[in-house]
From Swiss-Prot:
Keyword Ribosomal protein: yes
HAMAP family with a match to the protein in the record: Ribosomal_bL33 (MF_00294)
Protein name: Large ribosomal subunit protein bL33
Organism of provenance: Rippkaea orientalis (strain PCC 8801 / RF-1)
A biological-process GO annotation: translation
Source organism phylogeny: Bacteria, Bacillati, Cyanobacteriota, Cyanophyceae, Oscillatoriophycideae
Length: 64
């Protein structure tokens, strides 16, 4: 039997300033994984979270 797909999906959030910022504490890009409800949040998610590479709170956008 095929499993029914749930409403919640796992997404990846990526720091928007790590790609362009060169004055970082350490090299790399900050990524968080979380889940979202497909029915309630249909668009791309944007959350302000702490980036350890930039050493500040930045906007993290959904990439996949």
């Amino acid at each position: 039997m095929a499993a029914k797909k749930g409403v919640r999906i796992i997404i990846t959030l990526e720091c928007t300033e790590c790609r362009t910022n060169t004055d970082k504490r350490s090299p790399g890009v900050s990524r968080y994984t979380t889940s979202k409800n497909r029915r309630n949040t249909t668009g791309r998610m944007e959350i302000k979270k702490f980036c350890p590479h930039c050493n500040t709170h930045t906007i993290h956008k959904e990439i996949k």
